[in-house]
Amino acid sequence: PQMMGIPLILIAIFLPTLLIYTSPTRLSTNRMTTLQLWLTNTITKQLFLPVNTPGHKWAAMLMTLMIXLLSMNLLGLLPYTFTPTTQLSMNMALAIPLWLATVLTGLRNQPTASLGHLLPEGTPTPLIPLLIIIETVSLFIRPLALGVRLTANLTAGHLLIQLISTAAFVLLPMMTLTALSTFIVLVLLTGLEIAVAMIQAYVFTLLLTLYL
């Protein structure tokens, strides 16, 4: 498949390389390297604001995860491509091990504080059993919420794009003006989906940092 004479397979192969930081071979950096450094530093600072210093060792892994999610989300908006992150199985395969790692790390390093989160301070005695059950359930629901949120947001956006593009294609021979207005809506929705793809990658990573 091609778009404006450009094979889409070339875009799918080379676009993610723009997000990967490569160490410059000389002292003066180019604009792309400067942009990569600025984005990496800005996002890392925002992600790790609520995390204490020992948790900063997760920075490299979580930034890699965010770039992987961002690449897959954006590449899924290209025609004739498939978005892996619209599959719940893949999102759960990412969410469950990372969530489990945060839980086990907390239990190993600060077992008392980790177990203390299951019972808020100042809880009335009659409510203690109920609150422990509620907090335990909410703890185990976290990976499901991560996976379902990412899947649902991307799937809903792709379905809307598919429906509106089909409507524009069907209306074109019958009502040209209506088809053109529908196409404008499609362009705006595509821009919104690009923003959603970026935001969802950021939110997925941000929630993992909050679980640390």
Curated annotation (Swiss-Prot):
One GO cellular component from the entry?
mitochondrial inner membrane
Write the record's keywords in alphabetical order, separated by commas: ATP synthesis, CF(0), Hydrogen ion transport, Ion transport, Membrane, Mitochondrion, Mitochondrion inner membrane, Transmembrane, Transmembrane helix, Transport
**Please, one GO biological process term?**
proton motive force-driven ATP synthesis
By its UniProt entry, which CDD domains does this protein fall under?
A: ATP-synt_Fo_a_6
The family database entries (Gene3D superfamilies) matched by this protein are listed as:
ATP synthase, F0 complex, subunit A
Membrane topology designation: Multi-pass membrane protein
Listed under catalytic activity are:
H(+)(in) = H(+)(out)
Grouped into one coarse class, the protein's main location is mitochondrion
A GO term, aspect molecular function: proton channel activity
UniProt-annotated location(s): Mitochondrion inner membrane
Q: Which InterPro entries match?
A: ATP_synth_F0_asu, ATP_synth_F0_asu_AS, ATP_synth_F0_asu_bact/mt, F0_ATP_A_sf
Listed transmembrane segments: 3-23, 58-78, 87-107, 128-148, 169-189, 192-212
Checking NCBIfam families in the record gives: ATP_synt_6_or_A
Physiological role: Subunit a, of the mitochondrial membrane ATP synthase complex (F(1)F(0) ATP synthase or Complex V) that produces ATP from ADP in the presence of a proton gradient across the membrane which is generated by electron transport complexes of the respiratory chain. ATP synthase complex consist of a soluble F(1) head domain - the catalytic core - and a membrane F(1) domain - the membrane proton channel. These two domains are linked by a central stalk rotating inside the F(1) region and a stationary peripheral stalk.
Summarize subunit and interaction data from the UniProt record for this chain. Component of the ATP synthase complex composed at least of ATP5F1A/subunit alpha, ATP5F1B/subunit beta, ATP5MC1/subunit c (homooctomer), MT-ATP6/subunit a, MT-ATP8/subunit 8, ATP5ME/subunit e, ATP5MF/subunit f, ATP5MG/subunit g, ATP5MK/subunit k, ATP5MJ/subunit j, ATP5F1C/subunit gamma, ATP5F1D/subunit delta, ATP5F1E/subunit epsilon, ATP5PF/subunit F6, ATP5PB/subunit b, ATP5PD/subunit d, ATP5PO/subunit OSCP.
Protein family = Belongs to the ATPase A chain family.
PANTHER family per record: ATP SYNTHASE SUBUNIT A (PTHR11410:SF0)
- The name of this protein is ATP synthase F(0) complex subunit a
Please name the source species.
Tropidurus hispidus (Peters' lava lizard)
